[in-house]
């Protein structure tokens, strides 16, 4: 089934990433686990739904970030990156992605965490009715001590994660 394929892919992706982190003396610190959502324009016909399926997203363009030329299939940020979509657009920055979400009625898959103060009211998060979870966190060198500003930033992230 598609759900078990996603789970196997995520499990393999996690194994590959753990090996790379270990080999480079890095560690991942999880802030929280999130259920998959989509970001869409508040004018998109799906914006009023309590949750959407991948099937309902088929007519809309899927927007994702370019991963760079040294991209590996196993580094993919998107939880459902193996899903076949008829319309794919890759962007390099968040502003372009949000402009295309609004202008083309596109969507992207995300954690559901959005800040209205930062992003305005034009973009909304809608839960995705698919199995899976996203591990949100940060990567640091093992045994490194963050700078004063780094510590302030990490404390702000942890506080934000607790309150979302």
Locations of the language-model features?
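Short beta-strand-to-loop elements that line the ligand-binding cleft
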Residues: 1, 64-65, 83-93
């Amino acid at each position: 089934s598609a759900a078990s394929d996603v789970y196997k892919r995520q499990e393999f992706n996690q194994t590959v990433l753990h090996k790379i982190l270990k080999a480079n003396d890095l560690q991942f610190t999880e802030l929280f686990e999130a259920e998959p959502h989509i970001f869409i324009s508040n004018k998109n016909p799906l914006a009023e739904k309590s949750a959407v399926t991948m099937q309902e997203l088929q007519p809309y363009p899927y927007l994702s970030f370019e991963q760079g030329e040294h991209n590996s299939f196993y580094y993919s940020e998107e939880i459902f990156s193996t899903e076949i979509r008829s319309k794919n657009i890759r962007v390099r920055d968040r502003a372009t992605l949000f402009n295309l979400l609004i202008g083309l009625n596109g969507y992207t898959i995300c954690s559901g965490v959005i800040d209205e103060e930062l992003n305005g009211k034009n973009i909304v998060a809608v839960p995705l009715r698919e199995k899976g979870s996203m591990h949100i966190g940060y990567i640091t060198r093992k045994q490194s001590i963050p700078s004063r500003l780094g510590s302030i930033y990490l404390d702000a992230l942890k506080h934000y994660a607790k309150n979302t």
